Each structure stands twice: as structure tokens, then as C-alpha cells.
């Protein structure tokens, strides 16, 4: 992390997953490791649904919004936890974070876990975005909804990383901070200044807004009987 992480409170709107434990584990494993696996996964609509659900399930892991990015690390940094009974002092990273001490091994380990898991989730959503264009014919009428939601998720994840790992400096002389990753394959993405980084965030959000104009949540459509109700719970998604 940079010299200082600004106190902030993450507002987590709805990572609500309506699956059993067994189903969750299966969907969470939807991470194609080869091009052949990806081609098979995205050969039908069910594969896209599984991949999108897998992104949400990945975000619900303890390293991300299942703990650290909701009531764990970021809450400690925001001084929402106090000393004593309200803080599990056996978890030494939290006690260090209370004093903004990021140099201890426990602190670094937790910071690395958050960083790695978030970029892993970004890579997964980038694969989904890539195949939404390659398999547009498979998605049909769902293209705008699936790709739009994926773009919004990518912007959301990157913005949270910016808030934690970059300085608040939007001047022309700002130093480069963190990368905005657009490709699913492992590659070194260039570090960007905060101002340039925000341009990418806004670009993804604007594209998402345009694609999601057909989303039932905006249209107020009754979709309870369509596709076994898949579109019926859009209010629980990022958009």
C-alpha cells in the first residue's frame, strides 16, 4: 500500500448468492485454465451464467467482500473497530492496521492476499467480457445484460483497488500508481496515474450503462416467467 490509506467505508450492495453450499463450490470453480476449456464453457448460455455467478462468488471470499473489503481490513483502517474486546487482537494484522503499520509481515501478507484475489477476480471477469464478444451469437438478447454487468464489475473492482493502493493525487504531476487490467491473459499492464486510471473506470461504466438500457431493472419489465426466472432478481446484482 502507499504511505497512507484514507479512511473509508465500503458500501457493499448485494453479493447475495442463492445457491447451496455444494452448488457454490462448483460454480466457484468456473475458471477456464485453457482456451479449449473456455471455448467449451462459453459454448452455451448456461456457461455464461455460471461464469458470471463465479465472479460474484469469488468476490465473496474472505480476502475480499466476505470479510476484508467489508467488515475486516477496511473497517479497521477506517477506525470502526476499537482496542480490546471489539478487536480480535490475536489477528495481529488488524492490530497493526489500527496504527496504519503496513510493514509488518502479517500486514503485508493480508495486503498481498487482497491485492491478488482482486486481480484474480478481474482476470475472470475479463475472460467473460472477451467471450461475450466472441460468442455474441450464443448470448443473443442477453448480450447487453451480461457484458454490461461484467464491465460494471470490472470498474467497481478497479475503483476499490485505487482507493486502497493509490495516493489521492489527480494533478498533472502525479506519479503512476496501479494498473487497470483489460486482458484476461497474464501480462504486465502499465501502471497509471490516478487521473488516467479514473478515465478507464468511467469508460467501463459508460459502456455498461449503454448496454444495460435493456435491463429489466430499468425497464420495469415482468420477467418472472422468462428463462426460469433468471432475470427476476436483477436488483441483487451490481447494476
Map each language-model feature to its residues.
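Extended ligand-binding clefts on enzyme/binding-domain cores
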Residues: 52, 56-64, 195-196, 227-239
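Short, flexible, mixed-charge acidic loops at enzyme active sites
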Residues: 168-181
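Conserved, well-structured interaction surfaces
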Residues: 90-165, 187-196, 207-213
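A structural signal for short, hydrophobic/glycine-enriched beta-strand patches
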Residues: 33, 76, 80-108, 115, ...
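Acidic interhelical loop/turn segments
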Residues: 133-142, 210-239
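Bacterial Sec-dependent N-terminal signal peptides
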Residues: 1-34
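Membrane-proximal, proline-rich intrinsically disordered regions
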Residues: 24-75
Amino acid at each position: 500500500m502507499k504511505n497512507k490509506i484514507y479512511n473509508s467505508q465500503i458500501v457493499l450492495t448485494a453479493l447475495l448468492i442463492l445457491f447451496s453450499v455444494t452448488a457454490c463450490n462448483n460454480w466457484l470453480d468456473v475458471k477456464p485454465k485453457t482456451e479449449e476449456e473456455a471455448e467449451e464453457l462459453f459454448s452455451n448460455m448456461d456457461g455464461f451464467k455460471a461464469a458470471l455467478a463465479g465472479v460474484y462468488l469469488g468476490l465473496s471470499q474472505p480476502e475480499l467482500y466476505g470479510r476484508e473489503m467489508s467488515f475486516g481490513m477496511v473497517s479497521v483502517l477506517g477506525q470502526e473497530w476499537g482496542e480490546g474486546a471489539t478487536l480480535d487482537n490475536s489477528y495481529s494484522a488488524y492490530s497493526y492496521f489500527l496504527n496504519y503499520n503496513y510493514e509488518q509481515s502479517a500486514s503485508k501478507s493480508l495486503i498481498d492476499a487482497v491485492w491478488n484475489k482482486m486481480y484474480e477476480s478481474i482476470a475472470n471477469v475479463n475472460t467473460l467480457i472477451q467471450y461475450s464478444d466472441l460468442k455474441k451469437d450464443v448470448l443473443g438478447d442477453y448480450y447487453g445484460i451480461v457484458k454490461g454487468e461484467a464491465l460494471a464489475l470490472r470498474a467497481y473492482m478497479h475503483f476499490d483497488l485505487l482507493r486502497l493502493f493509490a495516493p489521492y493525487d489527480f494533478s498533472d504531476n502525479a506519479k503512476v500508481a496501479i494498473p487497470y487490467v483489460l486482458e484476461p491473459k497474464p501480462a504486465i499492464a502499465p501502471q497509471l496515474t490516478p487521473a488516467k486510471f479514473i478515465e478507464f473506470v468511467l469508460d467501463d461504466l459508460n459502456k455498461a450503462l449503454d448496454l444495460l438500457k435493456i435491463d429489466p431493472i430499468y425497464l420495469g419489465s415482468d420477467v418472472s416467467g422468462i428463462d426460469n426466472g433468471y432475470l427476476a432478481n436483477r436488483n441483487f446484482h451490481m447494476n
